[in-house]
């Protein structure tokens, strides 16, 4: 298979979007260098690595240029978000398959090769996700179900126990590949034909659920989404965003959740979802106030709940959340 310039396609294009995560990014690239590029023999796959820097201010760009000259580095002037950043990289890519890889990941031996082989051997599969591990090698949840009112009303743990095939999780591990709704975007393999037929990641999400929405569209097009548990990747977990701005992150998650329902469910479900979320937050605020007085460590959590409830009550202003912070920095 040739690209538009008549050059044979590489087996895999690795796309990493990063934002102010210099140290973990350098570790991720070192793992690619150690596990993939240094490999020899018949099992070696041809790869390219594209790093899309979302306007970092921590020296990430300079460090990558200095230490990893083999990386195709795209230096963006601002934070475009996860989906748009990945799409910039995907548009640059030339691989038969693409891997969307978080900056806070570490590759383990054979993870890439086994997922590429699985895609090659199963043309009906459009997306593959490996098993994500914590740094201590314990398992992370890396499978998503499509958001629904059922999963909002019934606790996730109950659904996993009653319907393990429909709601798979690390609690009930699978040894063989299993078809799922969606896999986590921290490490997501997608075949080139999907990009051409379905399109790139939906850009109406700034952060959260963009890969879930994408998998929804990919499955609608007739492709399968599969979790391959024998392929394993370490995920340090939220190094670039979740630990830095917890309240903004939670606001952004709510915004993405409501957007998913507007796009893929009906208006009634969308309204019911928001009602459920508001009632839950109000309950957390009332009960959490007493707990916060008793345990000062919970005071920050209670303040975050108040702010998120306020965001709902004043009409969900666009200036709040991660995307709002990007707009505010751009206008300043």
Question: Model segments located where?
Answer:
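Short, well-formed alpha-helical segments that are part of the catalytic scaffolds
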Residues: 21-40
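A conserved acidic beta->alpha catalytic loop
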Residues: 31, 53-61, 78, 108
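Glycine-rich, basic loop-to-helix element that forms the pyrophosphate-binding segment
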Residues: 75-93, 114
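Short aromatic/hydrophobic "clamp" motif used to bind/position activated sugar donors
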Residues: 98
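Conserved donor NDP-sugar-binding/catalytic core segment of glycosyltransferases
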Residues: 106-142
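Short, flexible, basic/aromatic active-site loop/helix in glycosyltransferases
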Residues: 147-181
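A short, conserved alpha-helix in the catalytic core of glycosyltransferases
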Residues: 173-175, 179-232
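Non-catalytic, C-terminal membrane-associated alpha-helical segments of glycosyltransferases
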Residues: 248-256, 267-332
């Amino acid at each position: 298979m040739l690209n538009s310039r008549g050059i044979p396609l590489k087996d895999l294009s690795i796309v990493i979007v990063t934002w102010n995560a210099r140290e973990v990014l350098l570790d991720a690239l070192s793992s690619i260098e150690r596990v993939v590029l240094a490999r020899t023999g018949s099992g070696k796959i041809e790869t390219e690595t594209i790093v899309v820097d979302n306007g970092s201010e921590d020296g990430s760009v300079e460090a990558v240029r200095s230490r990893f000259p083999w990386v195709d580095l795209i230096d963006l002037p601002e934070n475009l978000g996860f989906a748009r950043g990945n799409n910039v990289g995907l548009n640059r890519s030339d691989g038969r398959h693409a891997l969307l890889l978080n900056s806070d990941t570490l590759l383990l031996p054979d993870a890439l090769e086994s997922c590429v082989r699985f895609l090659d051997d199963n043309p009906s599969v459009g997306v593959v996700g490996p098993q994500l591990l914590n740094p201590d090698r314990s398992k992370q949840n890396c499978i998503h179900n499509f958001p629904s009112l059922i999963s909002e009303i019934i606790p996730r743990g109950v659904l996993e126990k009653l319907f393990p095939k429909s709601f798979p999780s690390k609690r009930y591990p699978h040894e063989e590949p299993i078809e799922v709704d969606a896999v986590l975007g921290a490490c997501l393999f997608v075949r080139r034909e999907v990009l051409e037929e379905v399109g790139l990641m939906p850009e109406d999400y700034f952060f959260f659920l963009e890969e879930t929405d994408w998998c929804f569209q990919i499955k609608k097009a007739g492709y399968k989404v599969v979790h391959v548990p024998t392929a394993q990747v370490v995920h340090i977990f939220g190094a670039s965003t979740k630990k830095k701005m917890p309240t903004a992150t939670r606001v952004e998650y709510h915004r993405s959740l409501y957007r998913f329902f507007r796009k893929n469910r009906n208006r009634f479900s969308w309204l019911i979802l928001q009602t459920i979320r508001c009632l839950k937050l109000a309950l957390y605020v009332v009960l959490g106030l007493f707990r916060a007085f008793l345990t000062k460590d919970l005071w920050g959590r209670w303040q975050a709940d108040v702010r998120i409830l306020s965001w709902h009550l004043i009409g969900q202003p666009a200036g709040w959340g991660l995307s709002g912070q990007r707009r505010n920095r751009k206008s300043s």
